[in-house]
Amino acid sequence: NSPFRHLVDIFLLKLKAKKIIRAKFNLTWKTDKILNSQYHVDTPIKSKTAIFYLNTNNGKTFFKNKKSVKSVENRMVTFNSSIKHMGTTHTDTDYRLVLNINYN
C-alpha cells in the first residue's frame, strides 16, 4: 500500500490498463556528456509499455527502428513491450525522471 499508488492509478485509467506487470520510476543525474544505455525490452511478457516524462531535458528514448522521443514534461509514449528501446542521460538539468509502466 504505497502512498504513490494513487498516482499510478491515474495513468492506468488513461491507458485503460487491466493489469500492471511492473511500474517504476527511473531517475538519472546530470552527466558531462549524453550517454546511451543498452537496447532492451522491459519484460518478455506480451504487454504494452508506457513511458511518462516528468520533466523536460535533453535526454531521449531511442527505439531500435531509429525513431526517438524527446524528454518533454507531461509527454507519454506507449508501445508494444517487445520493441527494443533505450534511454539516454542528459546534460542540461540536474535530473531526469520518467515513470515506466508495463501493463496489459
Task: State the predicted function of each range.
Residues N1-M76, S82, M86-L97, N102-N104:
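Fe(II)/2-oxoglutarate oxygenase catalytic core
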